[in-house]
A protein has these predicted regions:
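Surface-exposed, secretory/extracytoplasmic low-complexity segments enriched in Ser/Thr/Asn/Gly/Pro
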Residues: 1-176, 180-199, 205, 253-255, ...
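Exported/periplasmic cell-wall-interacting domains
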Residues: 56, 171, 189-262
Length: 262
């Protein structure tokens, strides 16, 4: 019977793929057996793959991986366990793109190893995905640390945003990636009524991580960092850093390195 043969061919082509995804060391396989359980029939008896099953598969993998946007536990330099509410760093699976790739691979009907697509990537792959290098800033202690491969590379006093002036306190209780980095840079403040920047500052090292907030040296501070300076004479929100420390951090971090502020 021709229609039966046709149906068998359709079923075989729908269930012919064998796809493997490896997530955190665990292999998930979509094979003939799985695909048979994903089949649905319409009112005319035609078979297709149930999209909700494909979606659920990707969602389940993404839920194991995603850290971006979720609160993050962190152990501070002093060994305290804290929770960072704002988290703009981490892994985030691009669910739509990953679903598209899954559908394409199923249509191709062959055996292949699959990779998920990501809208955000972290530096590390373990549960604590900070990677080999991270920067830690304590507002209360006005201190910044930089770690590389578990070793302390820099410990320095800093001056953060001026808490006596509205809108200048450095945003804290979060984790952000370094967006970009450059040397010999002139920072410009917001424009005043005449269209001129409110301030300009030339810096040797510039590492923004949260909008206009970044780590940089500042010659005008001389050797005055740390202590209570931030309470009355702090920055516009940035992390003012002694030159040598800024240089070492600049040479240690890369774009995407996480910065933790609390």
């Amino acid at each position: 019977d021709e229609s039966l043969n046709e149906q068998m061919n359709t079923l075989n082509s729908l269930t012919g793929a064998k796809l493997t995804y490896t997530v955190k060391g665990t292999v998930s396989t979509i094979d003939h057996e799985v695909l048979k359980s994903w089949l649905v029939q319409d009112e005319n008896g035609n078979y297709s793959i149930d999209e909700s099953k494909e979606k659920a598969f990707i969602e389940q993998l993404a839920d194991q991986i995603d850290t971006y946007g979720k609160s993050r536990k962190f152990t501070t330099h002093d060994g305290a366990q804290i929770t960072l509410a704002t988290n703009r760093y981490g892994w985030q699976v691009d669910r739509e793109k990953s679903l598209e790739n899954l559908k394409t691979a199923l249509a191709e009907g062959k055996e292949q190893e699959m990779e998920l697509s990501y809208s955000h990537k972290a530096k590390g792959t373990s549960d604590n995905d900070l990677g080999d290098v991270y920067v830690e800033i304590s507002i209360d202690r006005q201190t910044m640390w930089c770690y590389k491969n578990g070793q302390l590379v820099v410990e320095t006093p800093v001056v953060t945003g001026d808490i006596s002036k509205e809108g200048r306190a450095t945003p804290k209780n979060g984790c952000w990636p370094i967006f970009w980095k450059t040397t010999e840079y002139t920072m410009k403040g917001p424009k005043d009524a005449n269209g001129q920047p409110e301030y300009t500052a030339f810096v040797h090292y510039w590492m923004p991580f949260n909008g206009g907030v970044g780590i940089h040296d500042l010659a005008s501070r001389g050797n005055n960092f740390g202590g209570d300076i931030y309470k009355t004479n702090g920055s516009h929100g940035c992390i003012n850093t002694p030159l040598e420390a800024a240089k070492t951090i600049y040479e240690t971090v890369s774009v995407g390195t996480p910065v933790i502020v609390y």
